[in-house]
Amino acid sequence: MPNLIRTGLLMAALTALFVAIGYWIGRGAGAAIALAFAAAGNFVAYWVSDRAVLAMYGAQPANQAAFPRLVAQVDRLASKAGLPPPRVYVIDNDQPNAFATGRNPQHAAIAVTTGLLGALDEAELAGVIAHELSHIRHRDTLTMTVTATLAGAIGMISNLAIFFGGSDERRSSPFAGIAGLLLLLLAPLTATLVQLAISRTREYAADARAASLTGQPLALARALMRIDEMARWVPNDDAERNPATASLFIVNPLSGTTFDTLFATHPPIRERVARLRHMAQFDVSKN
């Protein structure tokens, strides 16, 4: 199944799950409100998601004078990829990480943390930037942002529904009450699994395209391992407060528990590194 169709079906599943929760809360009216809320959320995500997520992480514009290495790398690789240079931002956070956002290549931005700039060498930084540019080129940024918006909304409405309960008819029926409780408890987990299904193929593809763009798959592999290792013990408090946005980052920014790791929105680093090492056996720059 083509990735575009598969992603569309998964996003439709998220919307259906959101509407189902609305139906449990208020039957037909609740479902209609949930559908309208989902549509409005996606509309807002399309137009202002980049500004919202950048503000959420306190990202500041990176200028050439303060961050010459970063800006030069982004401009060089964007030109090589045939993309307009995205806006570049820096987040004051010790955890090395990065993400891209924006509805299309003409309205895109790349944000990196100060921890990333201090932890990676030139080749490794180029690999990370190329990875994010790949997301921009193939409009993964829009897909991941809309998915994160829906997943976050599902978690929020599930918590509200558990607190306030469903309709009177639902509360009067033990079976309906149990079924509804299961729906509300499992909905956020299901949303995370859908995020994982969308993210997995897109992260692998972005890794491969980044390696092809730079011609240095091992540099990206080293970067992924270093980011993953440091993310385990260097917290990202903003990401912990907004876990639905974790899928935007190149490496999962959440410290988490073993249970959380099982349902992380990123494919395992060891698998990503193994694929890059396999690519290194060939002249990826000619692919």
UniProtKB/Swiss-Prot annotation:
Record field: transmembrane: 5-25, 28-48, 146-166, 174-194
Q: Give the membrane topology, semicolon-separated if more than one.
A: Multi-pass membrane protein
Q: Which domain of life is it from?
A: Bacteria
Q: What is its main location?
A: membrane
Protein's cellular compartments: Cell inner membrane
Where is the catalytic site?
E132
Q: Which residues bind Zn(2+)?
A: H131, H135, E203
Q: Name one Pfam family in it.
A: Peptidase_M48
What would you give as a GO molecular function for this chain, any one?
Answer: metalloendopeptidase activity
Q: Name one GO biological process term.
A: proteolysis
Name what cofactor the protein needs.
Zn(2+)
Cite the entry's keywords alphabetically.
Answer: Cell inner membrane, Cell membrane, Hydrolase, Membrane, Metal-binding, Metalloprotease, Protease, Transmembrane, Transmembrane helix, Zinc
Q: What is its EC number?
A: 3.4.24.-
Q: What class of enzyme is it?
A: hydrolase
What are the annotated GO cellular component locations?
plasma membrane
Copy out the cofactor comment. Answer: Binds 1 zinc ion per subunit.
Q: Which family does it belong to?
A: Belongs to the peptidase M48B family.
**Protein name (database record):** Protease HtpX homolog
Q: What is the lineage of its organism?
A: Bacteria, Pseudomonadati, Pseudomonadota, Alphaproteobacteria, Acetobacterales
